[in-house]
Amino acid sequence: RFLNQKRFLSLDLTYGYPLGVPMYNYLMENGMTPKEYEWFTHNQVKGRCIMRNDYYVTNEHIVHPDGHTQAAGEIFGYYVITSQYYHRYRLPIMHTETNIKMPASAEWLLKQWANVHRLKRDGVPIVGFTWYSLTHQVDWDSALRDDAGRVNKLGLYDLDRKIMPVGTAYNKLIEN
């Protein structure tokens, strides 16, 4: 429960969402002063924001009784998680980043697109959608820490500008 509340903390401060006692205590125990917290309550920027949501198959985690976490794959999915954020903050949303390695990428794209349309149909103001990235990445699997020259096949196009199946699927979505 604590980690679930903590995932909202930075946005709660940014958007002026009232904190519960556990999160307030967590901030105070970890170095924030009451005066600093008060600054956030008077300087929220919600009125000028669009919420951006990245969603990858690695986003969701299982929290074990001893507190350690592990990647869980897709349990709730983009629709459920984004609905939670929308109902909490009531901001327009852009699905800003998603991908998965080939050959699952075209299917993943269609699933994310369907989630975006379901949210829109349910009244959530969706303002955009992005597949990341336009081209395959090099050494993205190591967050660019290793200069190994590994091509990560995540793009709409390969590094020779040849369209990938996910790129073709993206084009069809845009055409419709």
Annotate each language-model stretch with its function.
Residues 1-107, 114-176:
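Active-site region of glycoside hydrolase catalytic domains
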